[in-house]
Amino acid sequence: MVEETSSGGGSSASPIKTIVVLVQENRSFDHMLGWFKELNPEIDGVSESEPRSNPLSTSDPNSAQIFFGKESQNIDPDPGHSFQAIYEQVFGKPFSDESPYPDPKMNGFVQNAEAITKGMSEKVVMQGFPPEKLPVFKELVQEFAVCDRWFSSLPSSTQPNRLYVHAATSNGAFSNDTNTLVRGFPQRTVFESLEESGFTFGIYYQSFPNCLFYRNMRKLKYVDNFHQYHLSFKRHCKEGKLPNYVVIEPRYFKILSAPANDDHPKNDVVEGQNLVKEIYEALRASPQWNEILFVVVYDEHGGYYDHVPTPVIGVPNPDGLVGPEPYNFKFDRLGVRVPALLISPWIEPGTVLHEPNGPEPTSQFEHSSIPATLKKIFNLKSFLTKRDEWAGTLDAVINRTSPRTDCPVTLPELPRARDIDIGTQEEDEDLTDFQIELIQAAAVLKGDHIKDIYPFKLADKMKVLDAARYVEEAFTRFHGESKKAKEEGRDEHEIVDLSKGSTRHSTPKSFVQKLFSCLICDN
């Protein structure tokens, strides 16, 4: 942990008393908001007068070019976004361990996509949405603020980037780390910092809360901080009972009765637009509205094109950890630029937030900006890592002396774009890597991690509908047993272990069962 500041904890002079965060999935800035430059020329996006392109081959100076268009579909395939794929997208060549890093030319998106699927670059990776296709974002960009310099925290996939949102580190993970996921990631989070300084937080989940990737969040003391979104969020807004820090987790599984609204390809962006609309309208109607900052951001770019070079100089390693062989990643460069919207009655219409003014000359907006902003606005006692100490803070966007009274009460309506046949078919689709990680975390809560099938075969035969039911059942059971244990007065630092009850009269454990039992044990 970074050394504690001398200011101590307590409230600041900021008018913001509640920060609401929604982290969506796998879209780049240019893909979602690049064409919004047509609405506001100050946005660093794309335009027809300055066309952007990538070559089919970066090694051929005479290569044909694929130009960035505005014909993205609501339901897209899922491009490559592994560490290796991102390296090629950013630097225009396959991974090498060069030091220092080469110049990030952002010219390898087409080459990488074509190696995966012929035609994917022109139809998917090099396409974006025009503003009229994303009417909720269109109104929010015009009415509030867009940040055109927010990068993912590292050039990798969902899990490590989401870990930075609340902890300013992935604890050395730069891809799915199943062993650590079993134990629970051990790093301190901003949730503990808020609690220690007397502030409140709530996690409003829709399918499975990935905040449970952090080990501490599984403890009995935090069981009452988890709320079902559809049962609690609008009610808490209406009653003025939102906590100081609100985390909204979208639906990560697309089923017919409740389509996914996390914007992950192939999920329909209409569902994501409707989720943002629903959240905004509930916040706008709340008596707490004049004290709210609502942040919408995406965890990583998902393999979609973006033209702004990723920062490779002056990015601090958060905690001295280095990624595994063969890449030995030092966590010293950021990922690709992602969409970010900032919404509050304290923001002037049409604001564009560019690079931050400090705290360091190389500082950038990235996911660690969220805990950094919480620390600054709520005057928390200490930083979490060197990364949130370095990251830009969002308070600069609060650029008024009084709250606006003309903020829209409602946002545009969007029709759902899929029919019953498509929805049923998608319930039978294979799982994404992140969905598999959610299953693995759910298995630990349920006690299934002691079985020989964990983690490698547990999700093998699951489709989307099976997985959605599994994680919901696992969390419901874990949460219910945790509530009972807390009501019984058990140690607040305890984590309920459902495997004990299920194995009390079972046969002796196999080696694999013993191994995974060891992995989740603090000792």
UniProtKB/Swiss-Prot annotation:
Domain of life, per lineage: Eukaryota
Q: Does the keyword Disulfide bond apply?
A: no
- Tell me, using the record's free text, what induces this protein: Induced by auxin in roots. Not induced by inorganic phosphate deprivation.
Q: Where is the composition biased (Polar residues)?
A: 52-64
GO term, biological process aspect, one = phosphate-containing compound metabolic process
Deletion phenotype, per the entry, is:
No visible phenotype under normal growth conditions.
What biological function has been recorded for the protein in this entry? Possesses specific phosphatase activity toward lysophosphatidic acid (LPA) in vitro. Does not show phospholipase C activity. May play a role in signal transduction and storage lipid synthesis. May be involved in brassinolide-mediated signaling in root development.
The name under which this protein is listed is: Non-specific phospholipase C3
The species is Arabidopsis thaliana
Lineage, uppermost ranks: Eukaryota, Viridiplantae, Streptophyta, Embryophyta, Tracheophyta
Q: Which gene encodes it?
A: NPC3
